[in-house]
């Protein structure tokens, strides 16, 4: 098929006010151009992409947030004669590619924008007759095996038969910055992805727990960020690493051992908050899911967030491990996250699962947490 345009559609952007909608459209176009070598036109709720490489376009458009669906199409003039000629050629290609034959039930879906001397129904009936004459296949408006779409917009027409799902969401970079705590595990990369899908620019903060973790953890983190960068065209992820091993050692030496994981998470939040203030981010994000591990009981979630004034968002909070894993598989981070990296050896045998604010504050004082956080923060690279 000799496509000459790809039609991209957005969803909730269209529900915004005209001013916000225009701003979001401009950002979406900018991100599309960052992902694809192309020219782009905007017109009445559609984005028309003219790529130099159609294979690259179809592959990368699936990773541009804000795009709900897209269709490779052929264009022509919006009159009966040109539509008949172009549709006939289009159907010939569908026959050659095995999409339609004399027994294929089909339907024409026509949409029209602008002033014309025909209605959408009249154009649909006309296009249907073109297909029947070409192939001899039956029309079935109720349960068609193939839908052929004809969009007539002012003096142009577009013909296509596929609607490919995009990632949806909002254009990346329209909702401000967030600091995401990203490990080499399964959950936090998914949390970062979901915040990107909601339009947030991501600053990924990784806590390097060496010597309690091995070099594989850091290597896998780098691979995960590289994979997530494929969804961040136009607004790349900023990667930051804090040396966190000394903080953990101080927590283990000065506070009850069972509080290690609680103090670890508390320190992460406070370092992330300082980083957020430095880079103008508005929230902290983590991969917490209620009850999944010891540090994610409701008691611990409350206690570890004490002393942090910035919003802490947990997009996975109500998802189970299977749901999170499915998303990780879809976005390409699961195969990296499941690699054996040795884990963290600072985890106590019996971690605290019912922490309260008073005991956490006492443990923070015992380890001189404020000083330890300042020292760790200065190590961020």
From Swiss-Prot:
The keyword Nucleus does not apply. CDD domains: PPase_ThiI, THUMP_ThiI. Transmembrane segments: none annotated. One of its GO terms (molecular function) is tRNA binding. PROSITE patterns: THUMP (PS51165). Keywords: ATP-binding, Cytoplasm, Nucleotide-binding, RNA-binding, Thiamine biosynthesis, Transferase, tRNA-binding. SUPFAM superfamilies: Adenine nucleotide alpha hydrolases-like, THUMP domain-like. InterPro entries: Rossmann-like_a/b/a_fold, ThiI_AANH, ThiI_fer, ThiI_N, THUMP_dom, THUMP_ThiI, tRNA_STrfase, tRNA_sulfurtransferase_ThiI. One of its GO terms (biological process) is tRNA 4-thiouridine biosynthesis. Catalyzes the ATP-dependent transfer of a sulfur to tRNA to produce 4-thiouridine in position 8 of tRNAs, which functions as a near-UV photosensor. Also catalyzes the transfer of sulfur to the sulfur carrier protein ThiS, forming ThiS-thiocarboxylate. This is a step in the synthesis of thiazole, in the thiamine biosynthesis pathway. The sulfur is donated as persulfide by IscS. Belongs to the ThiI family. This is Probable tRNA sulfurtransferase. It comes from Methanobrevibacter smithii (strain ATCC 35061 / DSM 861 / OCM 144 / PS).
């Amino acid at each position: 098929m000799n496509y000459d345009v790809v039609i991209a559609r957005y969803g909730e952007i269209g529900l915004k006010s005209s001013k916000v909608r225009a701003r979001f459209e401009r950002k979406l176009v900018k991100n599309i151009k960052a992902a694809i070598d192309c020219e782009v036109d905007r017109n009445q709720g559609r984005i028309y992409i003219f790529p130099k490489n159609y294979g690259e376009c179809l592959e990368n458009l699936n990773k541009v947030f804000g795009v709900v669906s897209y269709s490779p199409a052929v264009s022509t003039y919006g009159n009966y004669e040109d539509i008949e000629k172009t549709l006939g050629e289009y159907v010939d290609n569908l026959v050659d590619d095995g999409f339609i034959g004399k027994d294929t039930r089909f339907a024409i879906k026509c949409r029209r924008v602008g002033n014309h001397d025909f209605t959408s129904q009249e154009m649909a009936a006309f296009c249907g007759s073109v297909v029947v004459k070409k192939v001899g296949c039956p029309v079935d408006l109720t349960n068609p095996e193939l839908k052929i779409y004809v969009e007539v917009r002012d003096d142009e027409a577009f013909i296509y038969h596929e609607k490919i799902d995009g990632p949806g969401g909002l254009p990346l970079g329209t909702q401000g910055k967030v600091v995401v705590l990203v490990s080499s595990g399964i959950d936090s990369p998914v949390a970062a992805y979901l915040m990107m899908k909601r339009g947030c620019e991501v600053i990924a903060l990784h806590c390097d727990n060496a010597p309690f973790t091995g070099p594989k953890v850091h290597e896998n983190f780098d691979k995960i960020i590289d994979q997530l960068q494929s969804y961040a065209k136009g607004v790349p992820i900023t990667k930051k690493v804090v040396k966190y091993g000394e903080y953990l050692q101080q927590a283990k030496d000065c506070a009850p051992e069972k509080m290690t994981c609680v103090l670890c998470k508390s320190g992460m939040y406070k370092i992330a908050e300082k980083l957020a203030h430095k880079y103008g981010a508005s929230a902290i994000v983590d991969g917490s899911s209620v009850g999944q591990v010891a540090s994610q009981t409701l008691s611990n979630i409350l206690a570890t967030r004490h002393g942090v004034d910035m919003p802490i968002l947990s997009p996975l909070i109500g998802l189970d491990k299977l749901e999170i894993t499915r998303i990780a598989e879809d976005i390409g981070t699961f195969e990296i996250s499941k690699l054996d990296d040795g884990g963290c050896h600072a985890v106590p045998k019996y971690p605290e699962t019912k922490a309260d604010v008073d005991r956490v504050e006492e443990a923070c004082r015992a380890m001189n947490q404020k000083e330890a956080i300042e020292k760790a923060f200065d190590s961020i690279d």
